[in-house]
Amino acid sequence: MDSSTITRKNILDDVTSLLTSFGFKTSNIYDRNCFDLLARKKDILIILKILVNIDSLTPTQAEELSKISGTFLASPIIIGYKSKHNYLEEDIVYERHEIPVISPQTLCNIIVNDIHPEIFAKRGGYYVKINGNLLKNLREKNNLSLKELADISHVSRETIYKYEKGNSQTYPETAMMLEQVLNSPITESINLLETNNTKTTTLDKKIQEPIELIKLGYDIKSSNKAPFDAISERQEETEEVRQLKEKLESKLDEIEKIRAEINKKTKHHNLLITNMERNRSDNTLNKIANCTEDISLITGHDALFVLEHKKDKEFIKKIPAIYTWELKNMDNMEELLKLIKERKEEANDS
């Protein structure tokens, strides 16, 4: 395709087609939001923003994208075609506002061929990350001292020492020279589909509505750049989470693995995609319901409407509607979750 004719819609259509062809469930497309598309395959959840020029991403969009991704335990990725100065190169990870950026072809290589990039771009050029433990093991296996390997590779002894201790960022040319000497790959790939490979935060703008959900123990965190009003996060720990935390304290060598499991269990059971009535018309509520049902399906989290005025309906489209007077009469979160489940079943049977 002629580069002058490439549009955001072209890229978005190609990305959606690619993901669905390889087993991902994809959401509707959400223009004018901090993300355009959600995609899930088994435990992988990615949130995508599509741009032709990656420098058009605003700090506000990036911050909101990062927070929503962190809240959903998803991986945020920006797919772009060029920057202000250059076209994006294949199999290189760029960055804008601390969110990874790749070209459509790089995404294709990841999804189709399971080839993850190793090179990332930063100020000063291109870099790779060396596996320090592997480097040390290979050096010792080849009976090389730090100085001997350094001399052969034309770097300092201190540089090799730093690589082995984990300060492993270096130029691709240096890594290639070490690999030639050791006759083995030593660089680490960047798996953008893993949430622990992206720096994210969670939604933190707490709001004080609906007060009835807050009294049941939920934190309500709003998003101004998403197709829903807020995420309601349950603060009460389940017994399963408490047991995992005990396990965490007793097995220090598995800290990261268990912490990730805690996060998964906590988030999976504790998030509600939340929409408020806010004097919206029935037509507007129906449009919001369509978006919310779609996002709920992809993320795997329940959704609800909190309504103040009696509308003689227990769901909007397929999304349970809970009234503020019902919330006031509840004693705990379990009652709410039970009612959501009942109304969800009624909606599906209707």
From Swiss-Prot:
Keyword terms of this UniProt record: DNA-binding, Transcription, Transcription regulation
Coiled coil: none
Keyword Zinc-finger (UniProt): no
Record GO terms (molecular function): DNA binding; DNA-binding transcription factor activity
SUPFAM superfamilies, per the entry: lambda repressor-like DNA-binding domains
Disulfide bonds: none
Pfam families reported for this sequence: HTH_3
Iron-sulfur found in the keyword field: no
Superkingdom as given in the UniProt entry: Archaea
Domain HTH cro/C1-type: 135-189
Protein's name in the database: Putative HTH-type transcriptional regulatory protein Msp_1143
Organism: Methanosphaera stadtmanae (strain ATCC 43021 / DSM 3091 / JCM 11832 / MCB-3)
